């Protein structure tokens, strides 16, 4: 069974980049009848908060990305300790006593020689007596994972294709701090093994991490999952944007963006498939394949999202929005108004046009025409086709046509020059209210 996981750190809110990661993990699991897991990587106990965790859950709920199970790394420290001891017994983790200042000095020396900042494994050469002396000074060791320099790192990425890393060109990663707390690398692997994760979907900034973690999977005697490393998002101008890092679900809600619009865009940008409006995210499962994703950065354009949002609103059924519409608006009202909306909450303004008071600046030369219109509106059959009947009668009586025929009527009846199709809107306004508005505009 396919098992994916979304593993945010609850040190902040979700932004558009990790919303995209969550979506693709969810889509891959759902498209293959698998499981989608939420894992809160909260090993940073100082910066992780329950408020942020709650906001992550709420954002996933708003998007409809409901996980099949949830776990918190802070509840799993005993498991990490157990697996760490296995690695320690194998000699695959080792204690290091350098201070941050000493490590920085080593990096500067290497940089001055034009060499990459690879850890020199000096800690492996320490004698028991030297370790004892360091600890007598009060130094507590941090721990590194010992990479196997004789095992080249290779995998076939679902997006990037064949990948190769030389472990001799990588530093042994620190997996545990001197205070005993955990860094990201090892707990992530331990959890992926324990949770049966089959596919790890994340950003391309994790490619080197994957190379390191593949050796951890092997050291722990576990099969490696498949990996898909996605190109990063850039703004509409084609550059990394600070704004993208601040765009989250709250911002999208404030813009009136429908969850399905955000999903429809993020599901397709960066792929060979066109971005299309859908009313149900399930329609996007067919054809969702990491082989369709390119390696070029994916452009996220807020204007494109807003345009897509409007197209989706124009196809949403009444049942999907009924709870967000103004009191009294029925299916006929929604279907009449929705072609003119860019966001659902604009419906209230158009419903006020139907039921509330309207006013407009009427040209003096149109007042007599509107008086005729009031009489004609009172005389026609309102059962069906009221707008067509009204304009036909007025055209025949006055000789007006085009804008001169229609615009004064729309202004008098709605107070606006543009809006929904009057064939659909006029029956909602109703005969009595329409006659009253026409007479008021004529006076």
Swiss-Prot record:
Gene3D superfamilies: 1.10.10.350, HUPs. It catalyses: tRNA(Glu) + L-glutamate + ATP = L-glutamyl-tRNA(Glu) + AMP + diphosphate. This is Glutamate--tRNA ligase 1. The lineage of its organism: Bacteria, Pseudomonadati, Pseudomonadota, Alphaproteobacteria, Sphingomonadales. The keyword Phosphoprotein does not apply. GO terms for biological process: glutamyl-tRNA aminoacylation. A motif ('KMSKS' region) lies at residues 239-243. The keyword Aminoacyl-tRNA synthetase applies. HAMAP family: Glu_tRNA_synth_type1. The gene is gltX1. Keywords: Aminoacyl-tRNA synthetase, ATP-binding, Cytoplasm, Ligase, Nucleotide-binding, Protein biosynthesis. ATP binds at residue 242. InterPro entries: aa-tRNA-synth_I_cd-bd, aa-tRNA-synth_I_codon-bd_sub2, aa-tRNA-synth_I_CS, aa_tRNA-synth_I_cd-bd_sf, Glu-tRNA-ligase_bac/mito, Glu/Gln-tRNA-synth, Glu/Gln-tRNA-synth_Ib_cat-dom, GluQ/Sye. A motif ('HIGH' region) lies at residues 8-18. It comes from Rhizorhabdus wittichii (strain DSM 6014 / CCUG 31198 / JCM 15750 / NBRC 105917 / EY 4224 / RW1). Belongs to the class-I aminoacyl-tRNA synthetase family. Glutamate--tRNA ligase type 1 subfamily.
